[in-house]
């Protein structure tokens, strides 16, 4: 049922959010996480492959690009991610999660496949850049649509650990990308090897598209957009699937019923004005988490090879082996301590991981300046730091995906993702200059101190502004805009502050 003037005025009464949140974990949820979570694996895969094949593309028997032209490949991919997040984020809130998580994956597949088909010579590097923009748009759109879908279909008590683990799988993709490029560049002729490396992602995406086709639309999105019959069909399908393995399902608390009036769509200008006017502390909190983690990650991730090469004299051919240890730390953090964000709580864990990673980076910076580290111990320090930082950074994505109303969730994710990427790109650019020719470690030392300060700032802000969202329904954290008589009704018209079920002190 699509919203009509009659339903818009009378509203729709529904228990669908409560029915989703009371479900036990089942094979359906595992299938959902695997099918949707591959987005982060693909992003890690793409970034790593692009970094590792870069030197090969300068050779005369490949594309014969200059070093600066190769460096621009990542820039164009990043630009694509930002525009993709904003464009597809808007469409996801308007057209639905399922439609978009099929489209965005297809866009990525096309872009990355075109990269592998880039002709050699002349001005074909423009074709290469264009294909990277397309691939980036697909992945950027994935961030907005997929985070929304996962949050809306995972039961409340599992949402934190699942979202953090899924975001952390970026590093599984980075690890896979390292192995792929080691094999492709060392065992296949260079002219073909880099192309084979770029085709691994599209092949994986093609398989996942068929899996995603069988997933239902988010019942939460459907009911909030007045599609009551479709929403009932989707939740019934999910409950039937869960019931096959879990037997009789827990009863639904009738007091959790919501009365909803579908709301009209809003643009990004109105969204930004509303977020920072009516949700100021939550907006500042979300932006701070995303900016600080993105700055540190881009600064370290895109320059680690230069640090190993210039300061520790590691040959480029051996750099990937150090990187695999770095990936392992980043992956294990979210997988092993992610559940604590649901049990100990968001505030303590987010502030704790940000503060601890900042403090550990200060210690590492002091050891680096004193010349007390070698390539192995430097990598071990990074691995320990990012064991905690990765969990915290993943929680940043979780935060911006759960603390704003459902009707604008994908657009809100897109906005904060775009802001973070813009600041993150400054980190890699700055650190590249600080490294210089590797003769003086003082400048990089202060760069590490700056990165540590950024993470500590994020931890302090989290301690004061975090939203205690653990175990709570999304509708209790931020009331949907269309809830009749609820605290979010008319937010874009009335000008009154709107919170949700969490106290203002927890992040208004």
Where in the sequence are the language-model features?
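Transmembrane-helix signature of 12-pass secondary carriers
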Residues: 1-508
């Amino acid at each position: 049922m699509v919203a009509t003037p009659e339903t818009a005025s009378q509203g729709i009464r529904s228990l669908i959010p409560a029915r989703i949140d009371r479900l036990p974990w089942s094979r359906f949820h595992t299938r959902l996480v695997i099918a949707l979570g591959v987005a982060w694996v693909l992003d890690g895969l793409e970034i790593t492959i692009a970094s590792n094949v870069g030197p090969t593309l300068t050779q005369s028997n490949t594309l014969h690009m200059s070093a600066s032209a190769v460096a621009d490949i990542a820039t164009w991919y990043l630009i694509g991610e930002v525009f993709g997040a904003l464009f597809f984020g808007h469409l996801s809130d308007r057209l639905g999660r399922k439609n978009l998580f099929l489209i965005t994956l297809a866009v990525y597949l096309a872009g990355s496949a075109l990269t592998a088909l880039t002709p050699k010579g002349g001005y074909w590097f423009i074709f290469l850049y264009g294909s990277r923009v397309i691939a980036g748009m697909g992945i950027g759109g994935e961030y907005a649509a997929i985070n929304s879908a996962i949050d809306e279909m995972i039961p409340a008590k599992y949402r934190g650990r699942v979202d953090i683990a899924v975001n952390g799988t970026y590093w599984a993709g980075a690890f896979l990308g390292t192995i792929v490029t080691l094999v492709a560049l060392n065992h296949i002729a260079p002219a073909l090897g880099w192309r084979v490396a770029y085709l691994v992602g599209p092949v994986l995406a093609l398989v996942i598209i068929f899996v995603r086709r069988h997933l239902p639309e988010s019942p939460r999105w459907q009911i909030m957009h007045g599609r009551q019959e479709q929403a009932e069909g989707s939740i019934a399908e999910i409950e039937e699937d869960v019931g096959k393995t879990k037997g009789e399902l827990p009863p639904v608390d009738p007091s959790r019923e919501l009365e909803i009036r579908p709301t009209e769509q809003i643009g990004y200008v109105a969204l930004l004005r509303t977020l920072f006017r009516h949700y100021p502390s939550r907006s500042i909190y979300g932006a701070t988490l995303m900016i600080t983690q993105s700055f540190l990650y881009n600064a370290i991730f895109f320059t680690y090879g230069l640090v190993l090469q210039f300061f520790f004299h590691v040959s480029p051919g051996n750099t990937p082996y150090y990187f695999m240890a770095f990936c392992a730390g980043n992956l294990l953090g979210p997988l092993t301590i992610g559940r604590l964000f649901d049990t100990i709580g968001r505030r303590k864990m987010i502030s704790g991981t940000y503060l601890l990673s900042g403090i550990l980076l200060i210690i590492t910076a002091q050891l680096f300046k004193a010349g007390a580290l070698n390539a192995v111990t430097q990598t071990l320090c990074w691995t320990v730091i990012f064991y905690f930082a990765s969990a915290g950074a993943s929680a940043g994505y979780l935060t911006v995906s759960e603390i704003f109303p459902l009707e604008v969730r994908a657009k809100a994710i897109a906005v904060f993702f775009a802001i973070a990427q813009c600041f993150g790109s400054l980190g890699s650019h700055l650190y590249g200059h600080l490294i210089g020719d590797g003769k003086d470690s003082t400048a990089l030392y202060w760069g590490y101190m700056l990165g540590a300060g950024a993470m500590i700032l994020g931890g302090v802000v989290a301690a004061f502004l975090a939203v205690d969202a653990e175990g709570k329904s999304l509708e209790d954290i931020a009331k949907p805009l269309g809830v009749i008589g609820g605290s979010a009704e008319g937010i874009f018209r009335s000008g009154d502050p709107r919170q949700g079920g969490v106290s203002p002190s927890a992040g208004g």
